[in-house]
């Protein structure tokens, strides 16, 4: 994948973001965190990354590793690390639903 050729379409980006926000994933609910992992793994696989699921401690859910091959293997790569939990308890979407107001979006896990 040539990252320089990726187009930026804010509507497409928001369409991809919304399922992530709508997937409630409290920190200590491993089933909920793993549902978020499933969404992320699917999206990364669609972009061409091989996915490795890494079981961690049973009280926090798994980790995933996605790798994108660098077109020039002798060049340094890029490491991106993130988390899939939102801290908020299940049911938070009822009080704090995903919404868009102009150029901003709101919901659990985003501003």
Regions found by a protein language model. Give the residues of each.
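Acidic/His- and Gly-rich active-site-bordering loop/insert found
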Residues: 2-111
């Amino acid at each position: 994948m040539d990252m320089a050729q990726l187009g930026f379409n804010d509507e497409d980006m928001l369409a991809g973001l919304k399922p992530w926000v709508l997937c409630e994933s409290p920190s200590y609910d491993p089933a909920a965190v793993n549902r978020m992992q499933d969404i992320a793994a699917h999206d990364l696989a669609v972009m061409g990354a091989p996915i490795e699921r890494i079981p961690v401690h049973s009280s926090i859910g798994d980790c995933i590793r996605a790798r994108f091959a660098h077109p020039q293997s002798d060049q340094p790569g890029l490491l991106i690390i993130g988390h899939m939990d939102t801290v908020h308890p299940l049911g938070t979407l009822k009080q704090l639903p995903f919404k868009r107001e102009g150029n901003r979006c709101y919901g659990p896990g985003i501003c």
